Amino acid sequence: MSGKLPAKGKLLPKFSLTTSALQDITNKDLAGKRVIFNIFPSIDTPTCATSTRKFNEIAASLQNTEIYCVSADLPFAQGRFCGTEGLTNVKTASSFRSNFGAAFGVNLTTSVLKGVLARAVVVADEKGKVLHTELVSEIASEPNYDAAINSLR
């Protein structure tokens, strides 16, 4: 990988992402909101699709919290998946033209998946302070959803 996940207790690194509406978002756009970044290689893999569905269910019960499902997929693919699946509680964001992977230390730099993002979860509070991080050790495994949610309590 290209670095280390943001450290717990520190502020999120500066980043930009692109939404399915092709709008760029940055740290400033998330100020005042709690955020969960569900980071993964591609929406077109079964585990990534499953985590997006599960976080969509979780998002329905969270107050003042936005969940961003982040991958290097083009925004069109992300939007198509959520539209087809009827997922309206999560937001998708693409790292395809940004520094996000490097800033969060999740760019895969070796293996057949070189160039996409590792599977990870980063949770931050309303001020952008990191509450929880998880780098999923096996790319085909799901993240620890409970740990992410419990970090918001």
Where do the model's predicted regions map?
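Chalcogenol-based redox active-site neighborhoods
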Residues: 1-153
